[in-house]
Amino acid sequence: MKVKAVAKQVPVTPRKXRLVVDLIRGKKIKEAESILMFTPRSASPILAKLLKSAVANSVHNFNFNIDDLYVEEIFVNEGIRLPRLFPRAKG
């Protein structure tokens, strides 16, 4: 059974986040947590929080054992771009 956790509106570029996501895909939960703890990227704390949420969902909702869990699928997509104002002459 798959357990799902979603993070939306994350202020990290998808390109930077994919570098970290590729490191933990297919790893056991404990190994993925240690990788995220020692990876000096801006997306690491956000992904660590997301991983912790997914583990909490699996333990609380489905009574899974933490030692049996691993990251089967994880991906990063581009979100909504905020409109920016470029101050310049418009006429």
Swiss-Prot record:
<keyword id="KW-0699">rRNA-binding</keyword>
<dbReference type="InterPro" id="IPR005727">
    <property type="entry name" value="Ribosomal_uL22_bac/chlpt-type"/>
</dbReference>
<keyword id="KW-0694">RNA-binding</keyword>
<dbReference type="GO" id="GO:0022625">
    <property type="term" value="C:cytosolic large ribosomal subunit"/>
</dbReference>
<dbReference type="InterPro" id="IPR036394">
    <property type="entry name" value="Ribosomal_uL22_sf"/>
</dbReference>
<comment type="function">
    <text>This protein binds specifically to 23S rRNA; its binding is stimulated by other ribosomal proteins, e.g. L4, L17, and L20. It is important during the early stages of 50S assembly. It makes multiple contacts with different domains of the 23S rRNA in the assembled 50S subunit and ribosome.</text>
</comment>
<dbReference type="InterPro" id="IPR001063">
    <property type="entry name" value="Ribosomal_uL22"/>
</dbReference>
<protein>
    <recommendedName>
        <fullName>Large ribosomal subunit protein uL22</fullName>
    </recommendedName>
</protein>
<dbReference type="InterPro" id="IPR047867">
    <property type="entry name" value="Ribosomal_uL22_bac/org-type"/>
</dbReference>
<keyword id="KW-0689">Ribosomal protein</keyword>
<dbReference type="GO" id="GO:0003735">
    <property type="term" value="F:structural constituent of ribosome"/>
</dbReference>
<keyword id="KW-0687">Ribonucleoprotein</keyword>
<comment type="subunit">
    <text>Part of the 50S ribosomal subunit.</text>
</comment>
<dbReference type="GO" id="GO:0019843">
    <property type="term" value="F:rRNA binding"/>
</dbReference>
<dbReference type="Pfam" id="PF00237">
    <property type="entry name" value="Ribosomal_L22"/>
</dbReference>
<comment type="similarity">
    <text>Belongs to the universal ribosomal protein uL22 family.</text>
</comment>
<dbReference type="GO" id="GO:0006412">
    <property type="term" value="P:translation"/>
</dbReference>
<comment type="function">
    <text>The globular domain of the protein is located near the polypeptide exit tunnel on the outside of the subunit, while an extended beta-hairpin is found that lines the wall of the exit tunnel in the center of the 70S ribosome.</text>
</comment>
